[in-house]
Amino acid sequence: MKILITGAKGQLGREISECFERGYTELGCPAILKEKNDIHLIDIDELDISKLSDVIALFEKERFDAVINCAAFTNVNLCETERELAFRANALGPRNLAIAAEKIGAKLIHVSTDYVFAGNGSTPYVEWDACEPQSAYGHTKYLGEEYIKQFSTKYFIVRTAWLYGYYGKNFVKTMINIAKEKGACKVVCDQIGNPTNAADLAHHLIKLLDTEEYGVYHGTGEGECSWYEFTKEIVSLSGINATVSPCTTDEYPTPAKRPAYSSLENMMFKTTVGNEFRPWREALKVFIENNSN
């Protein structure tokens, strides 16, 4: 299979490309990894996905069988002021990929976010719940989803949350560094979600390539917690002698509104290709053990 990975230099894009290179994921070996695949890695410096003519030209030249879109503008606060940049990356780019993929009959896997929801509920969101984004980031990601639905027939939209991995910057690495350097950290306790190991998500995205179970998916670590609880577990598993204190969202204001409760239920994975996301504590433990070596 000829596969294009966009956003290939990001933490998820690199995780996926590494899986193809070594022939297995941290969770096993999806069937497609046993095949001989032609993997193309592209990032913003090689292709601006907001330019439709460039995207179509590449797709018509290379004739990809599938595209995994990991490209996004994920600085949630900066999206509030850089709205055009956010729109180009998170909405226009996915639209262009959908148009180009449809022209050549390619599958499109697109990574989205829990921020498409209002975050004011008390039970986990399922894939068919109504979207109501509260931030510029959430709005642009939602628009990206809608464009894909409009222009593609062979799509997988996979919403994830609280992603961390071996590559690039992320919350887990940041908290470990702060705890080591300062011996204390203060973290919000009234925002609830699902910590997700990029290795788990990569495994599931690769599995989707072998199916035609198109639609919207949720892909997150099993179980939910607050950022405060997440940080306490990070510090504890890392064996760092540091104090973790709770604070409220009101005590820690940010330019972009965060969802108070955005826990996702992986209903589609559970009922179609199979849900193998690890409990978030288990996945975090493995990550920290591997990352400390």
Question: Where do the PLM segments sit?
Answer:
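Glycine-rich Rossmann NAD(P)(H)-binding loop
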Residues: 187-192, 217-224, 272
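NAD(P)H-binding glycine-rich loop region in Rossmannoid oxidoreductase-like domains
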Residues: 49-89
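NAD(P)-dependent short-chain dehydrogenase/reductase
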Residues: 146-193, 199-200
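N-terminal Rossmann NAD(P)H-binding glycine-rich loop of SDR-like oxidoreductase domains
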Residues: 1-26
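Rossmann-fold cofactor-recognition segment
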Residues: 38-53
